[in-house]
Every structure is written in C-alpha cells, then in structure tokens.
A protein has these predicted regions:
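P-loop/Walker A NTP-binding region and its immediately flanking N-terminal helices
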Residues: 1-148, 152-158, 164, 176-177, ...
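C-terminal helical "lid" of AAA+/P-loop NTPase domains
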Residues: 99, 179-185, 191-205, 226-227, ...
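Amphipathic alpha-helical repeat elements characteristic of tetratricopeptide repeat
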Residues: 140, 157, 176, 215-223, ...
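Short conserved motifs of the RecA-like P-loop NTPase core
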Residues: 162, 173-185, 207-211, 218-221
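Conserved C-terminal helix/linker of AAA+ ATPases
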Residues: 197, 201-224, 270-274
Length: 302
C-alpha cells in the first residue's frame, strides 16, 4: 500500500499544521444546527479531502455513506442531475450521507447551476463538502451557500517531521539529507512528499538524493518554459522544453498561472503576462498535454 494512503490521518489530532482550520471545524461540530454545505480551499495535495473525510466522520457519517466525487472527470450537468436524484434516498448505512466533491472548480457552469439548486434545498440527512484549488472558478452563488475554510500547505519543517515520523514507524533507513530535500521539492504538499519517499526507498541509498533532486529539476524546467513564453522565444526552444516535461499538464498550467499572477501583483505592467494568463485560465483536463502545447504555440505566435 502506498505510504500516502497508509498514513492518511484518521482524526483531527493527526493533522499537521492548519490548527486554526481544525479548531474552527471542531467548533462547527459543537453547534446544534450544522451547515449542510462546506467549502475547503487550498493548494493541491495539502490535505483538503483528508480533512473533509475526518469532518464527515465527526458528523456521524458511516464510512460507507461518504461519497467522493472527482469533479475533474465527472463535471457535466448529467452528473449533477444524478446527484440531485440520489440525495432523495436515505443512506443504507447510518443516518446521514456526505458528498465530498473534489476539484469543484473543474465543473461546468451547468453543473454548478444544478448543484446550486441542490444546495438551496438540501435534505436534512445530506451534507456537501466541496474542495477546490481555485475558488475564483466557482460561482459566487455556490460559494455563498457554503461555510468556507482555508487549508494551507505545510512548511518544510513540518514536512520533514512528518517524513521522519513515518520512516520511524515503517523502520525505513534513509539519509537525513534526503528527507530534507524531499521536504523542499514537495513544496508543502504532504501527499507529494510521501509519493517521492515511496519512490526513493526502492533504490540504492547512494542514488536517493539524486532522484529527489530530479523532481526539483522538473520545476526548474517549468520556470524555464515561463521565461521562454515571456521573452518571445522561438517555437523550437519552447517545444524542446515541453517535450522534456513529465509533470501533469494541469499542474503545469496552475504553476504558470500562479507565477504570472505573482508578477502582476508585484506591480509589473506587462501585457504579455496578461496574455499568458488568458491562454492558461481554463483547465487542461479534457486533452492534457495537447492543450498545453497548443496554448504555448498560440502565445509564441501572437
């Protein structure tokens, strides 16, 4: 079993960092009249769905009545209509049912419109927990129906402590500098840190640090791609970088978008940055690498 699954927190006491969010959710649980719709906002892999599952359990939901929906692959109005129909039925296990909808920002406008009708008239035995990395893509009317909580990425120290703790539990012998490097390249994402740890423990100790640093090289290549797009480079150079990228196209899109957003917020007036953001504003779920390539080509051709 993968480490990130095996060591997924089962209780709020096991959550590292995000203490403010945990305390707020625990306070919500003490209320007599709970909200039936929640929105968790935070970067990919920071623990949103884990916190959602723990919260669902604390509400008194049976494990088999917690339903996770990946909005990245099921985002049409038909899915929303099916959802509206299924909530009418009482749960087979326990007295309540909780729907966790991950990547809600990837859903279509029609899905969100259909979901809104459900949120406006939710049965007493139904709860919704929506998770997103990009709240700007969620309809305001949907957001206002939810109690909103932010989940932050972990700092390097907390990631390192998590890795050390798990290595001790699993009796994994690994160099300290490797764990520190994993903490750096995982960029606050515990899931990513454990995925990398899973990979490196399978190889010879002398190669481990090199493998971890190769993950860092991928991020450097993404930065290189951004610079090429900003400096009107020729397509041949851009294509060369694109060919070497193995990262998920959607993650690359978000990295580019966040990088450009940071530049604009720092006060730089550059229409090219706005142009890049415009080409990368929509998700690449439907065609992946092909849409990434097309977006880059169109930017270079402008």
């Amino acid at each position: 079993m993968a480490l990130y699954i095996k060591h997924r927190p089962k209780d709020f006491t096991e959550i590292i960092s995000n203490k403010g969010t945990v305390l707020s959710l625990e306070a919500e649980l003490k209320k007599e009249d709970h909200s039936h719709s929640y929105l968790l906002i935070g970067p990919s892999g920071c623990g949103k769905t884990t916190i959602a599952r723990i919260f669902a359990n604390k509400l008194g939901c049976h494990e088999k009545s917690i339903i996770e929906i990946d909005a990245g692959s099921e985002r049409g109005v038909e899915t929303a209509d099916n959802l509206r129909e299924s909530i009418l039925y009482t749960p087979i296990y326990g007295s309540i049912k909780v729907y966790i909808i991950d990547e809600i920002q990837a859903t279509s406008a029609k899905f969100q419109e259909a979901l809104l009708k459900t949120l406006e008239d939710t049965p007493k035995h139904i709860y919704f927990i929506l998770c997103t990395t990009d709240p700007q893509k969620i309809k305001k009317t949907v957001k206002t129906r939810c109690s909103t909580y932010e989940v932050s990425a972990l700092n390097n120290i907390n990631i390192y402590k998590l890795l050390s703790k798990i290595c001790k539990k699993e009796n994994i012998q690994i160099q300290d500098d490797v764990l520190k490097e994993i903490a750096i390249v995982s960029e606050g994402c515990p899931r990513q840190a454990l995925v990398i740890l899973d990979q490196v423990i399978l190889v010879e100790p002398s190669y481990r640090l090199k493998i971890v640093k190769s993950s860092k090289i991928e991020k450097e290549e993404i930065k290189k791609l951004i610079k090429l797009l900003l400096t009107n480079s020729n397509w041949k150079d851009v294509a060369k970088v694109l060919k070497g990228l193995k990262e998920d196209p959607e993650k690359i899109r978000m990295s580019i978008l966040m990088y450009c957003n940071a530049i604009l917020l720092n006060g730089k007036n550059d229409p090219k940055i706005a142009l890049i953001m415009d080409y990368f504003k929509d998700p690449f779920y439907s065609a992946g690498k092909a849409l990434l390539t097309l977006a880059c080509y169109n930017i270079i051709s402008e």
